[in-house]
UniProtKB/Swiss-Prot annotation:
<keyword id="KW-0699">rRNA-binding</keyword>
<comment type="function">
    <text>One of two assembly initiator proteins, it binds directly to the 5'-end of the 23S rRNA, where it nucleates assembly of the 50S subunit.</text>
</comment>
<keyword id="KW-0689">Ribosomal protein</keyword>
<dbReference type="GO" id="GO:1990904">
    <property type="term" value="C:ribonucleoprotein complex"/>
</dbReference>
<dbReference type="InterPro" id="IPR041988">
    <property type="entry name" value="Ribosomal_uL24_KOW"/>
</dbReference>
<dbReference type="Pfam" id="PF17136">
    <property type="entry name" value="ribosomal_L24"/>
</dbReference>
<dbReference type="GO" id="GO:0006412">
    <property type="term" value="P:translation"/>
</dbReference>
<comment type="similarity">
    <text>Belongs to the universal ribosomal protein uL24 family.</text>
</comment>
<dbReference type="GO" id="GO:0019843">
    <property type="term" value="F:rRNA binding"/>
</dbReference>
<dbReference type="Pfam" id="PF00467">
    <property type="entry name" value="KOW"/>
</dbReference>
<keyword id="KW-0687">Ribonucleoprotein</keyword>
<dbReference type="InterPro" id="IPR005824">
    <property type="entry name" value="KOW"/>
</dbReference>
<dbReference type="GO" id="GO:0005840">
    <property type="term" value="C:ribosome"/>
</dbReference>
<keyword id="KW-0694">RNA-binding</keyword>
<dbReference type="InterPro" id="IPR008991">
    <property type="entry name" value="Translation_prot_SH3-like_sf"/>
</dbReference>
<comment type="subunit">
    <text>Part of the 50S ribosomal subunit.</text>
</comment>
<dbReference type="GO" id="GO:0003735">
    <property type="term" value="F:structural constituent of ribosome"/>
</dbReference>
């Protein structure tokens, strides 16, 4: 099945501590989760590793968020939207359900 949300898509968080935030998807994981820039930040306690030149300390990083908790942002309507698929010229393309415009 083709992915409704892909890398570089702008999404709106629908649930969780970052509800309402708008950001870009930086990575899509095969487990049905996404890593979204600046969303779901967690603090990781990192050990120093002198061989790799990594300093120790508390590092803030993005944790994966469930794909069902985000919706793609439609810039034409200014709201979160759903995505559908259709064939155009023999190619499968994504479109917004609210206004039938193609997703860029």
């Amino acid at each position: 099945m083709a992915a409704k949300i892909r890398r570089e898509d702008e999404v709106v968080v629908l649930a969780g501590k970052d509800k309402g935030k708008r950001a870009k998807v930086s990575q899509v994981l095969p487990t049905g989760k996404l890593i979204v820039e600046g969303v779901n930040l967690v603090k990781k306690h990192q050990k120093p590793n002198p061989q790799l030149g990594v300093a120790g300390g508390i590092v803030e990083q993005e944790a994966p968020i469930q794909a069902s908790n985000v919706a793609i942002f439609n810039s034409a309507t200014g709201k979160a939207d759903r995505v559908g698929f259709r064939l155009e010229d023999g190619k499968k393309v994504r479109f917004f359900k609210s206004n039938s415009e193609l997703v860029k």
